[in-house]
């Protein structure tokens, strides 16, 4: 919660520190935040101002606006769920440049709900064949670590990784 200006200031302070250490900022965005920050598919300047390098979209427009968003003038890479196959394929047919797209698997906070390594590899191979990068979530064994809500079973993409040390995942 907070005003548009408070949200921008909060995240801008964070992204400055991240960039100072040479890291890339990937910001997760749902439709509510997108509209609250008054962003549009033709104007992502608010995210550029915040310092976002990759914008992970938790929603799509399901029309030609996805291609416009992906080809944004701000140069922000657009990340979509690996499950958005039809959305991404349609966006590319509508002129989206594949080099402006990345994908990311979801995380699974509840034990026994995450996909297997084999299932993840199948979808990774699909995107790899299209030269579109894929990201996953790794799980933390640190007690008291958290996610977007209280969780106690980690936030892995792959079920087999849930209880593995980070250096093995």
Regions inferred by a protein language model and the residue ranges of each:
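Catalytic domains of carbohydrate-active enzymes, especially glycoside hydrolases
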Residues: 1, 45-55
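Glycine-rich, proline-tolerant flexible connector loops at the mouths of alpha/beta enzymes
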Residues: 1-14
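Short, small-residue-enriched loops and turns at beta-alpha junctions
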Residues: 2-4, 31-37, 84-86, 109-112
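Surface-exposed amphipathic alpha-helices with a cationic face
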Residues: 12-22, 48, 67-73, 124-128
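Short, well-ordered coil/turn segments that N-cap beta-strands
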Residues: 19-25, 51-53, 72-76, 97-101, ...
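Catalytic beta/alpha-barrel core
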Residues: 29, 51-63, 76-86, 102-109
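Distinct, well-ordered alpha-helical segments
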Residues: 36-45, 66-68, 87-96
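Catalytic alpha/beta core domains of metabolic enzymes, predominantly
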Residues: 83-168
